[in-house]
Amino acid sequence: MSMIPRLLRRMAAVLAGLALLLVALAVSYRWVPPPGSPLMAIRLAQGAPGIDRRWVPLDAISPHLVAAVVASEDSRFCTHHGIDWDAVEAARDHNEAGGRLRGASTLSMQTAKNAFLWPDRTWLRKGAELGFTLLIEATWPKRRIAEVYLNLAEWGDGIFGAEAAARRHFGKPAADLSAQEAALLAAVLPNPRRWSPERPTAYIRNRAATIERRMAIVRRDGLAACILDPA
């Protein structure tokens, strides 16, 4: 009988060690670029011929793309601490009213998912995402969260990060993206393997136009100031 408590203690020690290792890894990414992401490995396993991913510092990414992503994905990024409770409440009310299912994922949550987790909708994955979100919000500055997000986001089959996306879709570095190009890239983020910024459908063109209008609000109200103009 004494073997069971001993086994449980060993399992607890292993789990605690694994948790500490993951925390140390997450904290290290404040300074060290992630070498890849679980989704990149999944895409390779699914048969992608390769991964086009070129890490660049945030200063080498057009401010237009920063504004576009904030406008389309998380307009309160600079003011929340990982979870946008207003968006959560709005999504709940919308879904309860019978509208098309809407999420409330913030840029911080998407960064946590992209850097550490697999694409899934299980409660286990969601719980892990919440934990990593709170961890990076506590240990990374907002500017770093945005930098990692923009370098890990998927923008097409085997295309990851703003630099690879800009070069593959528009033939230019991410630093030179125009406002219109940035809006198109942001417009396809919900499903970048289905939609293309190079050959936008009418829906994507309309979505990009809406994002461009919101980008003006982002600039006017300083909604991306924590990324573009940190104190």
From Swiss-Prot:
Task: Spell out the subcellular localization from the entry.
Answer: Cell inner membrane
| An annotated Gene Ontology molecular function | pentosyltransferase activity
User: Does Membrane count among this protein's keywords?
Assistant: yes
Signal peptide region: none
Q: What class of enzyme is it?
A: transferase
GO cellular-component term (any) = plasma membrane
User: Where would you say this protein principally sits, based on its record?
Assistant: membrane
Q: In which pathway does it act?
A: Cell wall biogenesis; peptidoglycan biosynthesis
Name-wise, this protein is Biosynthetic peptidoglycan transglycosylase
